[in-house]
Amino acid sequence: SHSKRYGIPRRDFIQYMATVSAIPLAAVTAECAVVDNPLFDGNPFTLGVASGDPEPDGVVLWTRLAPNPLQHGGMPNEAVRTRWEVATDEGFTNVVRSGTALAMPQLGHSVHVEVDKLKSHSWYFYRFHVGNETSPIGRTRTAPARDAMPDRVRFAFTSCQHYESGYFNGYPHLQKEDLDLVVHLGDYIYEYGGQENRVRKHIGSEINSLPDYRMRYTQYRLDKSLQETHRMFPWLVTWDDHEFDNNYANLVSEQDGISPEKFLARRMNAYQAYYEFMPLRRRSFPHGPHMTLYRGCQYGQLANFQVLDTRQYRTDQPNGDRTKPLTGKVFDPQGTMLGDRQEHWLMSNLLRSTSTWNVLAQQVMMAPLNRGEGDDRRYSMDQWPGYEVSRRRLLKF
């Protein structure tokens, strides 16, 4: 209808678009509102630094200013100018790239810098400055040249890190590895409210608003093991469902009776917070409740990573979700995990790829794992076996 856009009330949509539209122009139009030398009561880099989406000539650098991280960041409602440096050595005696970037209140004072003109397949060190404060020194690595054949590519993948279920003890082990890249396959956070008698407790109830989602990411990123792994390696990230809501499928909520307006308004909050906290390029900037996260990442002629999004475009889970026999809607030719556009993009990339290995960085199990007992064979309808026609198309490639 004329009163809605993306299923969201027009007034809310216009307010959102006015906010995000102002961001690229901020450096031009808001010079008088930019704070160049802020003073902080505490360390503004409590959430550390990160890098991601490596290319042969560059990488994304990330930080977020939050002197009081659990008090919604503790930043004033104004833009702050940060300075960044990239060097070939940890002492920064050979700085090869530097510049400034605005930390905008509209994006929770997060900073995303796309650095280019770097050498391929090389380690670099980076840091941010704001006022008289300096961030921890991050380490990152560019990808090999597209026509190069490196001897090896070493990467680790992580996923499904539930804060309440335990400490992130895998990360200190990962930090000891000689890695080129960390790939996160989704469920970076969990959206559930805090539970008693768990190892750790989420702050607040189930998250819904933008401040809620920001707080949850903040709580996770304050974990020292996670923060340190971000500091040490570039990351390639994608989401699954819990960055928004359990088992959602495109525009369909797991719960019955959720209006499209509420669903999309919440998805908009979730997607914006995800972008704010991840080292992503501007090409992934969210547009309302939509965000293009699927993308490629090539490591020379050795490996070609295809990063997938199996949530935003899929059809509803068949047979009422959960674990069910492979019958009925499982074989619906219209059933899709990726959506037409993403599947076409993926197949085109695979056809064009000349790399030895094509790696699908994606969220859910491809193999049909029987979760039943005896002759009662049951499979997760939320995973690829629930989308059997789509699965077979991909495996036939």
Label for each model-derived stretch:
Residues 1-25, 32-397:
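Metal-dependent phosphoester/phosphodiester hydrolase catalytic core
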